Amino acid sequence: MATVPTRSGSPRQLTTKQTGDAWEAQARRWLEGKGLRFIAANVNERGGEIDLIMREGRTTVFVEVRYRRSALYGGAAASVTRSKQHKLLQTARLWLARHNGSFDTVDCRFDVVAFTGNEVEWIKDAFNDHS
């Protein structure tokens, strides 16, 4: 778990949620620097969550953000399993429906922003509803 210095000078442990939020904020800034426009963060639908929803031109981009301290067990990108992909697809499907859209009517893709140590990897179109 990550630590952060407190005002008293002694470090305090960050919760998993706080650590995840920090990496998601970093991914958002990084993607905005690449020209994407922010739409939403931490979108919850039945049974799933999408870390970031961005826009690149006319494309809606659903982003999964992952962080791993090292690549010892395959790195951050390797942690996006088929099961996780299925949940993300279902969550995106529900979000699109709430916004009067579907995979058939909205140009969209699923990206992964993976932080492994100090390295960032942006995997565009990492998976889709036909995978």
UniProtKB/Swiss-Prot annotation:
CDD domains: PoNe_Nuclease. Residues 1-19 have a biased composition (Polar residues). Residues 1-21 are annotated as: Disordered. It comes from the Bacteria. GO terms for molecular function: nucleic acid binding. Disulfide bonds: none annotated. InterPro entries: Restrct_endonuc-II-like, tRNA_endonuc-like_dom_sf, UPF0102_YraN-like. Belongs to the UPF0102 family. This is UPF0102 protein YraN. It comes from Shigella sonnei (strain Ss046).
